[in-house]
């Protein structure tokens, strides 16, 4: 038997993010479904007052984990244009798609052809017209420069060394003046021998050296071990 929803409220800090309260007292994040009736990764669909919401699982999405862990500022609004590096099969991009709405746009770069096909099946083929799938390697932004116009945000979530460098290189190509970057640091993908905190510092210093002001850093435990989310702005 499903647990009844007793309330849905707007998140106090983040546009387009909602908090769903259930009758047992538990609360879950959600976004308003841009394509009602359709799921992306098996998430629960929640009906409330003639609207449909998609539960946003912090164990499946590092952005959701950052929100649950108290990040105060995320530079994503209705109409935001974003370059998303490491789109994978589309879990987090799908929720960003809900948030930015029909006026927004998410250029979604994925390296693996198999995963790329899955992304298209789950998002584009299901009617998410604000998502532009790009099969490419985030290390080489010139390869897809003819597809991407200036963006408000560059987001990266890749299992590569030099994650901050890859992000900054893409920002040099595509980020509008005064734009923001969102860096998911995967410490074990950079150096399995160093403490995660040292790897975080190293990547943050790379962003600073490339002209970014660090606005906020949040660790993602217990949802993702040795991961952190960094929000920064181009000076």
From Swiss-Prot:
GO terms for biological process: box C/D sno(s)RNA 3'-end processing; tRNA processing. Pfam families: Fibrillarin. The keyword Kinase does not apply. InterPro entries: Fibrillarin (IPR000692), Fibrillarin_CS (IPR020813), SAM-dependent_MTases_sf (IPR029063). It comes from the Archaea. Its EC number is 2.1.1.-. Keywords: Methyltransferase, RNA-binding, rRNA processing, Transferase, tRNA processing. SUPFAM superfamilies: S-adenosyl-L-methionine-dependent methyltransferases (SSF53335). S-adenosyl-L-methionine binds at residues 91-92, 110-111, 137-138, 157-160. PROSITE patterns: FIBRILLARIN. One of its GO terms (molecular function) is RNA binding. Involved in pre-rRNA and tRNA processing. Utilizes the methyl donor S-adenosyl-L-methionine to catalyze the site-specific 2'-hydroxyl methylation of ribose moieties in rRNA and tRNA. Site specificity is provided by a guide RNA that base pairs with the substrate. Methylation occurs at a characteristic distance from the sequence involved in base pairing with the guide RNA. Belongs to the methyltransferase superfamily. Fibrillarin family. Interacts with nop5. Component of box C/D small ribonucleoprotein (sRNP) particles that contain rpl7ae, FlpA and nop5, plus a guide RNA. HAMAP family: RNA_methyltransf_FlpA (MF_00351). This is Fibrillarin-like rRNA/tRNA 2'-O-methyltransferase. It comes from Pyrobaculum islandicum (strain DSM 4184 / JCM 9189 / GEO3).
